[in-house]
From Swiss-Prot:
Residues covered by the OBG-type G domain: 160-334
Molecular function via GO: GTP binding; GTPase activity; magnesium ion binding
HAMAP family linked: GTPase_Obg
Cofactor(s) required, per the database record: Mg(2+)
Region (Disordered): 385-408
EC number(s) stated in the UniProt entry for this protein: 3.6.5.-
Domain Obg: residue ranges: 1-159
Organism annotation: Azoarcus sp. (strain BH72)
Transmembrane region(s): none
Name of protein: GTPase Obg
Keyword check for Magnesium: yes
Keywords attached to this entry: Cytoplasm, GTP-binding, Hydrolase, Magnesium, Metal-binding, Nucleotide-binding
PANTHER family to which the protein is assigned, alphabetical: DEVELOPMENTALLY REGULATED GTP-BINDING PROTEIN-RELATED (PTHR11702), MITOCHONDRIAL RIBOSOME-ASSOCIATED GTPASE 2 (PTHR11702:SF31)
InterPro entries cross-referenced by the UniProt entry: G_OBG, GTP-bd, GTP-bd_Obg/CgtA, GTP1-OBG_CS, GTP1_OBG_dom, GTP1_OBG_dom_sf, OBG_GTPase, P-loop_NTPase
């Protein structure tokens, strides 16, 4: 199946049903009053991440999706049936944005993640809602609200831990075949790889990582030259980049150092964050060099290239040096994942503390308010008691005057 990593679609939520303007009509009840029901809500459109999908090809041919309209309200206060929602399934890693405003809507980075794309319209009100003491037979009703309509841009960024980059024919596809079960096409000509390939590398039963191979880059890729610039987005979610270099090119005019530095410059032009990712240098095709020439060739390359974070020397075709590289990658990724989990746990703990503090402050405020209310009630009771005593005293004085008429 051809790989599609970009698409544009239109989603339209259902309109709400209209409210009804009807009146109760029964035998012996000449003026039954209004009984129009509300319209049903319109169906909404949702997106869900599905790990069983790996391309947006479905959305290149069908581009418009419309949810069901809500039914109109009926007599006898019958509500209209709500419209059916629709759910669109996308590959994990799909980024959805509004095509008109450019506003990001969702990043479906976790399998099963569900996001609302377009909200269905509310149903209209029946005339039953407009009955009042001065209008006993209203004919007013409201129409259903229109559902949301949005034009969306879909962009798939594959979820991989390690990304491969390099010039065409640097041996990237051969490397991914050597370390995983992926079987991309390989050949002795440039641009053998025309679309991204993913491979799962297992270092033991419980440890693995995903590696992504994209078409080779050439100088000027950031401005649109070649194929690789179309797929650089797939490296943005990776934790580390492997920069493969052909250390033994067939063409004597090819300078591996110049080509390697050109790739680094294209990364910088395309995306600064991608340029700043951890990047390991992998010197490939050592099997094409005589054993006594390998060390001098590697030393000369590193001296001309400049400082590197880490470098490895391999032969992807013969598997030489690949085992040490993948175990180094696994250790690095385990450390990265542990750091990510620790940061996430720290954020969750901080959020729990914030919520606990807010709850404590709210409880204290409620307790203070309750105490103030109790104090106010006590003062009111004291005032009532004083008023009652005063009234009793007045009543006693009045009774005394009535009992002794000579006291005047």
């Amino acid at each position: 199946m051809k790989f599609f990593d970009e698409a544009r679609i239109e989603v339209v939520a259902g309109d709400g049903g209209n409210g009804a303007a009807t009146f109760r009509r029964e035998k012996f009840i000449p003026r039954g009053g209004p009984d129009g029901g509300d319209g049903g809500r319109g169906g909404s459109v949702y997106a869900v991440a599905d790990r069983n999908l790996n391309t947006l090809v479905e959305y290149r041919f069908k581009r418009s999706f419309r949810a069901e309209r809500g039914e109109n309200g009926g007599s006898k206060d019958c509500y209209g049936k709500g419209g059916e929602d629709i759910t669109l399934h996308f590959p994990v890693g799909t980024v959805i944005s509004d095509l008109d405003s450019g506003e990001p809507i969702a990043d479906l980075d976790v399998d099963g993640k569900r996001v609302l794309l377009a909200q269905g319209g509310r149903g209209g009100l029946g005339n039953l809602h407009f009955k009042s003491s001065v209008n006993r037979a209203p004919r007013k009703r409201t129409m259903g609200q229109e559902g949301e309509r949005r034009n969306l841009h879909l962009e798939l960024k594959v979820l991989a831990d390690v990304g491969l980059l390099g010039m065409p024919n640097a041996g990237k596809s051969t490397f991914i075949r050597a370390v995983s079960a992926a079987r991309p096409k390989v050949g002795d000509y440039p641009f053998t790889t025309l679309q991204p390939n993913l491979g799962v590398v297992r270092t033991d039963e419980n440890r693995s990582f995903v590696i992504a191979d994209i078409p080779g880059l050439i100088e000027g890729a950031a401005e649109g030259a070649g194929l690789g610039h179309q797929f650089l987005r797939h490296l943005q979610r990776t934790h580390v980049l492997l920069h493969l270099v052909d250390l033994a090119p067939f063409d004597p005019e090819v300078d591996p150092v110049r080509d390697a530095l050109a790739i680094v410059e294209e990364l910088r032009k395309y995306d600064e964050s991608l340029y700043n990712k951890p990047r390991w240098l992998v010197l490939n095709k050592l099997d094409l060099l005589e054993p006594e020439d390998r060390a001098p060739r590697v030393a000369a390359f590193l001296e001309a290239y400049g400082e590197v974070e880490r470098h490895f020397e391999i032969s992807a075709l013969q598997g030489e040096g690949c085992r040490g590289l993948i175990f180094a990658l696994q250790d690095f990724l385990d450390s990265e994942r542990a750091n990510i989990h620790a940061q996430q746990a720290a954020r969750e703990a901080e959020e729990r503390q914030r919520l606990a503090a807010a709850q404590s402050a709210r409880s204290a405020a409620e307790a203070e308010a309750l105490e103030a209310d109790l104090a106010e009630d006590a003062l009111a009771e004291d005032a009532l008691a004083e008023d009652a005593l005063a009234e009793d005293a007045l009543d006693d004085d009045a009774d005394g005057e009535d009992a002794d008429p000579n006291a005047r």
